[in-house]
Design a protein with these regions (language model features):
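Glycine-centered tight-turn motifs at strand-turn-strand junctions
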Residues: 168-198
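Short beta-strands and strand-coil junctions in structured, solvent-facing domains, enriched
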Residues: 42, 116-120, 192-194
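Conserved aromatic beta-strand anchor motif in extracellular beta-sandwich/beta-rich domains
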Residues: 159-163
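Short, solvent-exposed loop/turn and secondary-structure capping segments
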Residues: 15-16, 54-57, 64, 121-124, ...
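Surface-exposed loop/edge segments in extracytoplasmic proteins
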Residues: 19-21, 165-172
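Beta-propeller blade termini and top-face loops
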Residues: 1-97, 104-107, 114-116
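Contiguous beta-strand segments within globular domains
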Residues: 85-156, 182-184
Length: 198
């Protein structure tokens, strides 16, 4: 696994430098320095005049081999989650009022999906875009078809959490999309009070 700072962003190679691709989310600007924080598997890139950027936990990139990415779906090994009580208080902010978004609390799982079933609505929109691109008329689908689209559920993934004895702890649901994504578990059991008064 290689990282490269360039005049046009940060690039990575998953195959010892044979192929390079730009890291998604990094701006197209000059990066002058890269530092790897080995304990947490974080990559820090210092740009020229724009500050610095942190890629939290790049360990999933190590498992993104051709074999793993060609599978229908792959769940990558997560890093150990830290159990602590998150605080909402700002505390003492000193002379400045600097606030940044904290990383997601709990266990964060990275996954890759090669294909996701499409819905009738997404297929219709794709077809309408092609017709629009070719400067053709877009037919009205009809009220029945639009009503059926509203009832249709989109594809989702369900992550099942179990303890070391195989006992069910919790299911976590997220809308599915093609490519890589992350889903987090806040280290809590499922609620035994699904309906609350009030």
């Amino acid at each position: 696994l290689f990282f490269l700072a360039t005049e046009f962003g940060i690039y990575t190679s998953l195959d010892a430098g044979n192929n390079w691709q730009k890291l998604p989310g990094t701006p197209t600007i000059s990066f002058r320095d890269l530092v790897i924080q080995e304990r947490e598997n974080d990559l820090v890139g210092a740009s020229f005049g724009r500050g610095f950027f942190v890629l939290d936990d790049y360990s999933a990139l190590r498992e993104m081999t051709k074999e793993n990415l060609s599978k229908k779906g792959k769940l990558f090994k997560p890093r150990d989650a830290k159990l602590f009580k998150p605080r909402n208080s700002l505390g003492n902010t000193g002379g400045q009022f600097y606030i940044a978004k904290n990383p997601t609390y709990g266990a964060v799982f990275t996954y890759h999906l090669n294909d996701v079933p499409s819905t009738s609505k997404s297929r219709r929109i794709r077809s309408e875009r092609m017709l629009n691109k070719d400067m053709k008329d877009i037919p009205f689908p009809g009220y029945d078809e639009l009503a059926a689209e509203m009832e249709e559920k989109s594809a989702s993934i369900i992550l099942t959490i179990k303890d070391s004895n195989g006992n069910h702890i919790r299911n976590i649901k997220k809308n599915a999309s093609k490519g890589s994504g992350k889903i987090a578990w806040n280290l809590r059991h499922k609620s035994y009070y699904p309906v609350r008064a009030g």
